[in-house]
Amino acid sequence: MNPNQKIITIGSVSLTIATACSLMQIAILATTVTLHFKQHECDSPASNQVMPCEPIIIERNITEIVYLNNTTIEKEICPEVVEYRNWSKPQCQITGFAPFSKDNSIRLSAGGDIWVTREPYVSCDPGKCYQFALGQGTTLDNKHSNGTIHDRIPHRTLLMNELGVPFHLGTKQVCVAWSSSSCHDGKAWLHVCVTGDDRNATASFIYDGRLVDSIGSWSQNILRTQESECVCINGTCTVVMTDGSASGRADTRILFIKEGKIVHISPLSGSAQHIEECSCYPRYPDVRCICRDNWKGSNRPVIDINMEDYSIDSSYVCSGLVGDTPRNDDSSSNSNCRDPNNERGNPGVKGWAFDNGDDVWMGRTISKDSRSGYETFKVIGGWSTPNSKSQVNRQVIVDNNNWSGYSGIFSVEGKSCINRCFYVELIRGRPQETRVWWTSNSIVVFCGTSGTYGTGSWPDGANINFMPI
């Protein structure tokens, strides 16, 4: 091969290699650009259309590393869409209730820094349950705990921890409140927090950690709310609030809130005469609440809330085994489903019940006169038949030698049904135990079960003689 042929051959090979390298670089550049722009797109499974990621709440930020010829490209995988809760599954069929949680706050206060609280409740987001309570701005072993029997002071705040975690010094103070309610709409928490002067209180509506709306007292007489969870269906949450006399006519209103903004207010209608401290649960597509009549009835009022047209109806639980305290002996107590029974209506205590076909599950103190002991049972026909008194599946939660207090319901969505759970406030200190100057509580929590269960008693358990004065 002569020199000219060698030059031509070498040149041809070099040109071929250069062309191949150029094509590879173009391919790498095209891949890089494509992946960069697809980083901000998701495939919608319903319509196979490309949707932007930006409006979607990010639960996880996953990064996938792709290696191409020593070139590293980072690609963000779009997360699943977070949806509002609708609670459309049926209610679980249960045989009774099984123990779920107990925080032992008072026992732990004997040797640790635990908040003084009252008015506890439980509520769950789609993945986890939390316990709430209204703190008194002090721990128990602290001179500020003197006088914490009082309900409304400016230092009270709403506390929030994972269920089962006592309210220690690291507990988050969600808002300023001496009355509250909380619920999760599937995307974020809503907290309704009431504080201020008795004659001119303010309710703040905090959504996703931001104050979105507020409303002032409308009757200038202790604006107050549920002291248990509110309920959200398809992005709209509802909460029951009362302003007015605690032992006479008051003004109850049902508020509808969308992402923290009040979108509608409905007045109470129906036959209920007095409403306080409702325990509400989803009954798709609506919401149902069992409340406290602090004026005329020891039978509990019922509020039915239509989430579509904002209409309200109210009545009373039909069961002749009534749920409030104080109350008449079971042999002489009554309820006609529509009206207060005018039997020891004042004062009362927060409680709960829920319908199960024609029957009703309910909880109440064992004592008919004071907040001691706690029991649950089902009343056959208790939701549909006036003065029904056939009791089955009774369980003792706290024996009658120990103090109880408020109780309320919360709902948990399972794979196939919605379970009903309840908590019991276990009050210690004043007014019943005058050796100490404080008033506080722990809680015990039970949930519905379709299985079998045993017996027991789950009181607070603290020896008052071991406690700080």
UniProtKB/Swiss-Prot annotation:
Residues annotated as glycosylated: 61, 69-70, 86, 146, 200, 234, 402
CDD domains: Influenza_NA
GO biological process: carbohydrate metabolic process; viral budding from plasma membrane
Annotated spans, Disordered: 325-349
GO cellular component, one term: host cell plasma membrane
Signal peptide interval: none
Keywords annotated in UniProt: Calcium, Disulfide bond, Glycoprotein, Glycosidase, Host cell membrane, Host membrane, Hydrolase, Membrane, Metal-binding, Signal-anchor, Transmembrane, Transmembrane helix, Virion
Cofactor(s) needed by this chain: Ca(2+)
E.C. code: 3.2.1.18
Modified how: N-glycosylated.
Region annotation Involved in apical transport and lipid raft association: where it falls in the sequence: 11-33
Topological domains, Virion surface: 30-469
Coiled coil: none
Ranges where the record places region Hypervariable stalk region: 36-88
Topology relative to the membrane: Single-pass type II membrane protein
Annotated transmembrane regions: 7-29
Main location: virion
Domain of life, per lineage: Viruses
One function term, GO molecular function aspect: metal ion binding
Family to which the UniProt record says this protein belongs: Belongs to the glycosyl hydrolase 34 family.
Further comment: The influenza A genome consist of 8 RNA segments. Genetic variation of hemagglutinin and/or neuraminidase genes results in the emergence of new influenza strains. The mechanism of variation can be the result of point mutations or the result of genetic reassortment between segments of two different strains.
Subunit note: Homotetramer.
Function according to Swiss-Prot or TrEMBL: Catalyzes the removal of terminal sialic acid residues from viral and cellular glycoconjugates. Cleaves off the terminal sialic acids on the glycosylated HA during virus budding to facilitate virus release. Additionally helps virus spread through the circulation by further removing sialic acids from the cell surface. These cleavages prevent self-aggregation and ensure the efficient spread of the progeny virus from cell to cell. Otherwise, infection would be limited to one round of replication.
Designated name of the protein: Neuraminidase
Source organism per UniProt: Influenza A virus (strain A/Leningrad/134/1957 H2N2)
